[in-house]
């Protein structure tokens, strides 16, 4: 089951850039498989249930106990890679929920989901999500796509052995929203030594924490996910600036607000496709299913 589910009125001087006579070609819009790739549940263990849950952790054959002390344990279900942590006193001292459960829903069948709910979740109160990873998988090559935001977003790119982009990070791990675009096919090959049949498999993943977990259905409304072709800009100085901005992210910091706005508009103009609209439409189609999946853990 695990492998099956693993196999998505600013100033007028800001004119549109002059592009080459060859028009933007019509692009085939990709399709997306959407899933929650990681969920972290937090809540407070009901005090009278502490012994029952601790005893279960100590005797269940599928659980590897990593640490066990009075009113505290860390454990892992070795079959489905489910992590469970409870710390009564740490939760109290830090004024936060004392129990945490982490898992990848894509790796769980219904029996595993029921195992989590019946043995842990039902003994917790004030349950909420502290992290949700929303994944969009597509067979389109996303190596040359970029995230464009009105706000300043840190970008980090890692290249594969063929010197092509393999993983792109937008934002920081500490932020409430952290975005990854990566070659899922290569990741599967590297980590599982499996070669999938599709020519390409890429993932756009939104790591949402804290308050952003409640906004998962609109978590990229403020972004553009584009594939700019810098060669289309005819004016040499603008073409050179666009190339520099695409390859040296720190150069955005050397521009004033108006200039940033100008070049962000140019990037949008020279991109034949913005994946955001397509992703929003697909998310709307699958939204009820995804809502039910989250609601399962809260009821």
Regions found by a protein language model. Give the residues of each.
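Helix-turn-helix DNA-binding segment
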Residues: 257-264
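Structured, helix-rich domain cores that form ligand/interaction pockets
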Residues: 1-255, 270-299
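Residue-level detection of the helix-turn-helix DNA-binding "recognition helix"
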Residues: 265-269
